[in-house]
Amino acid sequence: LRGLTLSVPKGEVHAIMGPNGSGKSTLAYILAGKPDYEVTEGSITWSGADLLEMAPDERAHAGVFLAFQYPIEIPGVASMTFLRTALNANRRARGHEELNTPDFIKLVRAKAESLNISMDMLKRPVNTGFSGGEKKRNEILQMALLEPRLAILDETDSGLDIDALRIVSQGVNQLANKDNAIVLVTHYQRLLNYIVPDYVHVMDAGRIIKTGGKELALELEERGYDWVSAEHQAASETRVAQEVS
């Protein structure tokens, strides 16, 4: 990432689009605090807190959630145990009482039903043997349970058929409200047919080079990304020429 500035207020949905290697997933990982990435300059502020001073678990407790493009399988860890541990860790961090087993099961059942997730699926280890669509729905189930204040979805539409995409999008739309923000990282406009963004940002070479409304996604679907890069390059050359003169 190089000189990237992005502001996502509560109550808004922002889509991040761009070609492969433009920095979209890097942005998602940095926001969530993935240890493999080093921030050498700049700052990240969310709800008055400096995220760069917080470990990944502290960011999660502060309401930051990342849905992975490729959710990993965790053999030997029961899905229900995983979900309850994550939920109660967040509740403790926010000063709330932990949910007992009956209340937890009731909550999970309601959330799972809204996402067309079978409770039988949750009897299996986390993501183990799940289809691509099941893994993505499981990510959204986690999001629905944790109720994050900043949800980052890294290419959640990748590998989904139309039915799975519709169900996952429905889950995201149920979460969206005036008290949280959602960042959608995607290659394709089709996700934005179901989750309508307030703003669409185009990334290239680690920078945001264009911002527009939902209509920008439609134009990108029709014309690709090259015209945006060319437009940005021309504008940059014009600025340099004006500074020299």
PLM features per residue range, with description:
Residues 32:
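Helix-to-loop junction immediately C-terminal to a conserved catalytic motif
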Residues 203, 207-230:
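Conserved beta-strand-loop-alpha-helix hinge in the C-terminal portion
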Residues 72-149:
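ABC-family P-loop ATPase nucleotide-binding domains
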Residues 43-59, 127:
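ABC ATPase NBD Q-loop/coupling interface
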Residues 155-156, 163:
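Walker B catalytic motif
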Residues 17-19:
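The feature captures the beta-strand-to-loop junction immediately N-terminal to the Walker
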Residues 165-178:
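Helical segment within the ABC ATPase nucleotide-binding domain
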